[in-house]
Amino acid sequence: PTGEQVKWRIIIIMQSFKTAAKTSFVGFLFTVVAGSLLHFAFAASGGNTLVGAFTPVNESVWEHLKLLLIPAVAFSAVEFFVYGKSLPAFFAAKSLSVMIGLAAIVMLFYTYTGIVGRNYLAADIGVFIVSAALTYYLSCVFVKCPALYSERANIIGISLVADIIILFIYFTFTPPMCGLFRDPVTDDFGIPDRFYSSILIDK
């Protein structure tokens, strides 16, 4: 590329950085609102298992990670067409920030419940909001990280998100019998019996 082409490429990238910062705030708000609504989607659908594959089917910590994952991934798709095409680390930055956000929910939840001995709804909401904010903040940081400026990093990022979504779908119907997947309300795992109606059987 010529010097002029490099110059314009740099200008476009810098403008995209600014757009990323502004869009991330919108993404944060979208994720908090959409995540809050998704909490009720499975019950509102009457226990539709297709809906349950992408929304919480019980009150376990694992299932509630969908409240961050699904809106964040959906908004990332929008961001890609708004400004992401111009950023060489877009997919790597997005996937890494989402993974850290999910880990933050788990760590913050078990840390505070370990200290106080139980969970509180207000604190759970706070954990979700803080983790969502962390996700979008880190996205703005990572998108400027030269270490992620490679096709390999982006491919790994896309693969990681795809794998984790597949894992969430699989564990919706076949959850491991461990604390992360246990519904503290029913002391059970997976889809509650009152909702369990397989799409394959129905169809």
Go through each PLM region and give its residues.
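N-terminal membrane topogenic signal
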Residues: 14-27
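Short aromatic-rich membrane-water interface segments that cap or initiate transmembrane helices
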Residues: 53-66, 190-203
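Small-polar-interrupted transmembrane alpha-helices in polytopic inner-membrane proteins
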Residues: 35, 39, 75, 79, ...
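Hydrophobic cores of alpha-helical transmembrane segments in multi-pass inner/ER membrane proteins
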Residues: 66-79, 129-141
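Non-cytosolic membrane-interface motifs at loop->transmembrane helix junctions
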Residues: 51-58, 116-128, 184-186
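Alpha-helical transmembrane segments of multi-pass membrane proteins
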Residues: 30-47, 169-174
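Juxtamembrane "helix-exit" motif on the non-cytosolic side of transmembrane helices
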Residues: 43-45, 108-117, 143, 172-175
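Final/C-terminal transmembrane alpha-helix of multipass membrane proteins
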Residues: 155-175
